[in-house]
Amino acid sequence: SMGINAIRTSHYPPHPRLLDLADEIGLWVMLEGDIETHGFEGNRTWIDNPSDDSRWEASYLDRTERAFERDKNHASIFCWSLGNESGTGCNLAAAARWLHERTNGRGIVHYEGDHAMEYVDIYSRMYPTLEEVAAVLDDTDLHAPVAVPSHASAAVDDAAKERIRSAPYIMCEYLHAMGTGPGGAAAYAQQMTHPRHAGGFVWEWRDHALWRTLPDGRRALAYGGDFGEEVHDGNFVCDGLVDALSRPYAGTWAWIRALAPDAPILRERSQKSGDEAEERLRALASKASFFLPIGEVESSAVFDDRGRVESVGELPITAEISVYRAPTDNDRGRGPVDYWGISSDDLGPLGTGTGQWGVSHAQRWEMARLHLLRRTWHGSPCESGMRVLIERWAPPAAQFGLEARWNFTPVDGKIGGAPAAAAIRGNCLAVKVEMTPYGQWPERIPRAGVRLCIPGSEWTASWVGETDIAYSDLPGANPDGFGCAELKDLWDVGVKPQEGGHRPGLKVLELRGEECALIIIPRSEMGWSASPWSERELAQAGHWEDLSESNRTFVWLDAVQDGIGTRSCGPDARPEFGARMTARTMEFILCVTDL
């Protein structure tokens, strides 16, 4: 139903019943043998690797022969993969030779580690850049580079490059689906129209999280290290298109839309009308400019002695600048395809970026102390009909920051010239904040916008705008849709807390509680998200159950958010999707009504 048409059985032959089902359903299968010597890679030296030690030839052939003979009659198998991440050498070549001889040359042999295509029939890559894909598919210069300088394929000779550019191409792994993401699927999908491009396999299908029982008797999903083991991969085992409970991630929906826009599951998921609630919110959204100023500002809101808003109507509310997000697994990625400080006009050889391992975006943000942003009051000048607040926001001991000039103006909820459906009986406050940066900000920032905080965590959200969780490189499906969800259901699925609730293109948002409703009507372009926990609380938690019960709700209104990418094990979010600190103005209306 997702439009998936092929399976790679990484990294060993599957249960036979899976192949029976694949035959029946019509799925293609890349049948992968049980060979992997990843631990011998070391510093890319492959010292004493069994793949190139003739004493291991019989074992390699035994595993290859057993896999083939067991499954040879399954119509779903389109090629035989020798194994995974085992370097290269004489034993893998012998296994490929056996398969070719056993099938009288008809069998298609795959193995990603044969970078020079000495014994396989398909050129295969893991996590290539878009430029690498384009280079492999471009046969105008048969001897041009086929890989970024740091990849082993960059060193192959001209004869190998000619073989590569005449062979079918497949990405045996791409778009590492770990945590929020992966971003960038659409660009890879566009390249798959080339006649030599056979497609690719996203890593991977399902999170490998297991149930554990907490001291209080609750059951929770767990990952590496949660069972007392000393050697583990943490939550690196949670990198599926669906979580351990088979719930698709937001990035999965974006990937399906890019690869299979007519997939049945997308039709089943199409948005339905919200009837009266939708009609009312759309009427409000269409009249954002019709809210007229009224009287004294104190008639709609309460401010402290420095001009900071404390409540609108009877609802306590605070407003702050926000530039940090709880890092995603991709924000924490350390791979060499790093686009930090890189321009879209110069991505380096075949899109390599900095080409340096080791430093993640999350580390850079935290080294810049963006998570510790502090404000300093700089004045509250009096202006007719509005409250003005001037602040400076900066990390501790930093030589950069921003000046925020807030204007708070009471407006009439009856909305002059608007239909009755758009009338609001309550207190309304127009908010305008001008953000002017100074000093040298980090090359990319997590976000820039406003964070509101209101009491209580039992809110129901209804909104007009993008209905799906989406980011600049992870587009949604319905930019002018209507959504409705409980606060707890607004965030992406997954076992480890991280950024994962942003919806761009907000036109109007209503949060309904037990006694009142908060309505937010943008007057400038912005996205939104909401959570009972702050970005720092989310960032510090290893599991959702580590978060204490909350009695407040944070609402983020973002002018910009950084892209997602797939750097947990692949390329960074590309520069064109990056968030940068620039001067910007945000405007919105806050209305509080009794229920």
What is each PLM-predicted segment?
Residues 1-282:
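Extended substrate-binding grooves/exosites of carbohydrate-active enzymes
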